[in-house]
């Protein structure tokens, strides 16, 4: 019997096609039977299976190979030069000083890198980005020359991988200075001191970078510092000369100081040396920025003289009175000048209370000479400008202390005779005044005033005559009646013009200095103008307004008995607080009274 392979129906022996589905079945039956038999034989003899242990063994070996290969690759990556350079670059870009100190290996074991001492290196790279780029390019280039940091192979890691270090060579500073025991600093950290003047001291090692090397020397009166910024790159040693710009200075007093005992002060501090003997002290600056003064017992008390700028290695000190003593001296000179002006008009030298007998005698001789020559003087003393830089103390052979100072006076004066008219003009003579200290009277006495050239100094103090008066020679002759005020108190064109000029200037000064007394002697007390101007001075000063008197003109004036009317044109530059000067012009009519030849204003409109 044959069975159809397609539908499984039974067919007769020898059939070629299935009677059920028509599938050919003829001769293939024998082949099929043979295949079936072969398959049966195969099933009867199966292949022997691989042992489980063998499978596990080979699987383990394969896995181990994979792991070892991966581990090798991982180890090679983590120990590679490129990764080390990448980490270093990242640390630099992040400013990670701890990481930089860890990654760098000093060539010299004496250089210990820390978070703090790698900062100069990092600063250099930040300040020079082009150099930073060059550095990392050289680290990655196998053929590049060594830069300040370079990669160097140093043995093996885990006996397999190449190990690299980032090497850095240290730098040193060869520092010298001109004074022994000068302290040396590198980036504000003390690094040593000078053992011998001008002999170099080696400071280091340091990591390459940007540094400030400084030398400091401090004594009782001076703190000297010299600094130099160093870019310590490209070499191993850097020479730095930090010579301090200072000198040992020898002090002595001027030859006209006979005796004394005191204390030499530098910048107001005692160095415990007697200046009345030659003294050498240092180091000190000689550029004029430091001063020397003397504290001593003078007849007028223990005082400290004014400071003299130290501008040389050999200083001959001029003793300069202290500020209070200067004020006393200048006030004495101004008072004597006022008394001298009056004495020249009447010959009365007894009222010269601050003058020496010799100066009184000279004044008397001047008056007698004018009388004998029929010469007259009309004078109004206004002020003196003192050159404070010309003050100097000295001693006479007998030990008497004297002082000299120069000043320029301002007068309105006229010298005339019986045949000329008196015309007052500004006169500005310059004098060198000499005063002596009187121990018995305990005050300064005016000795002399010698004509001199006008001082070119800029340290000037102006002292005004608080109550200027015009004095005329009492012996003036009758041939010049037109030049004098009449007995009735009539005033002249000249008087009116000079009066108004003085009044307007004093008005500006009063406003600027908030000092009404500077102008009140030109005003009638109790008048409306007196009260108004007193209020105005205070008001303008509080507002911060200032006045600069520029020009004026007396357009006309008239006098009727003691009453006077004056019409003026005036120019002032007015500056309000925070503003700029602006020119203001005014036309005023003043009224006033004349008393004993003097004008006193009472109102303005």
Swiss-Prot record:
Any one of the GO CC terms: plasma membrane
Top-level taxon: Bacteria
InterPro entries: NTF2_YvbJ, TcaA_2nd, TcaA_4th, Zinc_ribbon_dom
Pfam name, any one: TcaA_3rd_4th
Primary localisation category: membrane
Keyword Transmembrane helix listed: yes
Keywords, sorted A to Z: Cell membrane, Membrane, Transmembrane, Transmembrane helix
Transmembrane segment boundaries: 56-78
UniProt-annotated location(s): Cell membrane
PANTHER family for the chain: MEMBRANE-ASSOCIATED PROTEIN TCAA
Record protein name field: Uncharacterized membrane protein YvbJ
Organism: Bacillus subtilis (strain 168)
Gene this chain is encoded by: yvbJ
